[in-house]
Curated annotation (Swiss-Prot):
CC annotations in GO: tRNA methyltransferase complex
Organism: Rhodospirillum rubrum (strain ATCC 11170 / ATH 1.1.1 / DSM 467 / LMG 4362 / NCIMB 8255 / S1)
The keyword Cell division is annotated on this UniProt entry: no
Family: Belongs to the class I-like SAM-binding methyltransferase superfamily. TrmB family.
Role noted for this protein: Catalyzes the formation of N(7)-methylguanine at position 46 (m7G46) in tRNA.
Residues that bind substrate: K142, D174, T212, R213, Y214, E215
Alphabetized InterPro entries for the sequence: SAM-dependent_MTases_sf, tRNA_(Gua-N-7)_MeTrfase_Trmb, tRNA_methyltr_TrmB_bact
Name used for this protein in its record: tRNA (guanine-N(7)-)-methyltransferase
Chemical reaction(s) catalysed: guanosine(46) in tRNA + S-adenosyl-L-methionine = N(7)-methylguanosine(46) in tRNA + S-adenosyl-L-homocysteine
Matches recorded under Gene3D superfamilies: Vaccinia Virus protein VP39 (3.40.50.150)
Length: 255
């Protein structure tokens, strides 16, 4: 059984870095308020209605946690105008960069949360997501920092609640320790199935997977990322069957 570290409720990571350009600061001041999720207006126990977040009806709702500079988020929004995307990122520089791309491309199917994503997850209704992305998160490589990693048993419970049956959890990392951690915890969770059938399924970027800035840096440094796709099992499935179902590819092909 994978270890279950107690989750650290505090936030760790940078919120601010080098000073923002004047144009990006202007976007933070003027554009961000209109795109920010309206969590402040929710009562206790109340949840957002995804249908009311976007200017037109959307067929699916996707969430990206820690979108970095927004390359993947904005590219997916442009490629899938029928999908509503929510992006969460606490680093002000990344939020400003994403706003610049949103402004340049004119996409209108993105909503943002520039704070801790743990404030968003309880406000979303059950089964509302068809895809959930955790791409190149901080690996927190030291053992004593394991509680700070995004992939945790309690967080996977949140993801399982939010993903619709058959929905996808997509995780990417160039840190093999984090990849093994992810596989250990996600495949141990009864709600998820790893979709890989062979090593090429996780060693090669899927065709619809947009390269991020962090991924490009990893490749330039000679680090080979892993691309993991997990599928949300049907809620109506027999629990005994879930426990016995294969997690994905054979052990010989694992990272």
């Amino acid at each position: 059984m994978p270890e279950k570290p107690t989750e650290d409720a505090r936030f760790y990571g940078r919120r601010k870095g080098k000073p923002l350009r004047a144009t990006r600061q202007r976007l933070l001041d003027t554009m961000l308020p209109a795109l920010t999720l309206p969590l402040a207006g929710l009562g206790e126990g109340e949840r957002l209605d995804p249908r009311g977040l976007f200017p037109r009806p959307v067929d699916q709702l996707w969430l990206e946690i820690g979108f970095g500079g927004g390359e993947h988020l904005v590219a997916q929004a442009a490629a899938h105008p029928e999908v509503g995307l929510i992006g969460s990122e606490v680093f002000a520089y990344g939020v400003g960069k994403a706003l610049s791309q949103i402004d340049e491309t004119g996409v209108d199917n993105i909503r943002l949360w520039p704070e801790d994503v743990r404030q968003v997850l309880p406000a979303l209704p059950d089964g509302c997501l068809q895809r959930l992305f955790v791409l190149f998160p901080d690996p927190w490589p030291k053992r004593r920092h394991a509680r700070r990693r995004m992939i945790q048993p309690a967080r996977l419970d949140d993801f399982a609640r939010l993903l619709a049956d058959g929905g996808e959890l997509r995780v990417a990392s160039d840190d093999m320790g984090y990849v093994r951690w992810t596989l250990m915890h996600v495949t141990a969770h009864p709600a998820f199935r790893w979709t890989a059938q062979g090593p090429t399924d996780w060693r090669e970027r899927p065709a619809d997977w947009v390269e991020t800035r962090y991924e490009a840096k990893a490749l330039q440094a000679g680090r080979k990322p892993a691309y993991l796709i997990f599928r949300r099992r049907p809620r109506a499935a027999d629990p005994g069957t879930l426990a016995e179902a294969p997690a994905g590819e054979g052990a010989d092909n694992n990272p």
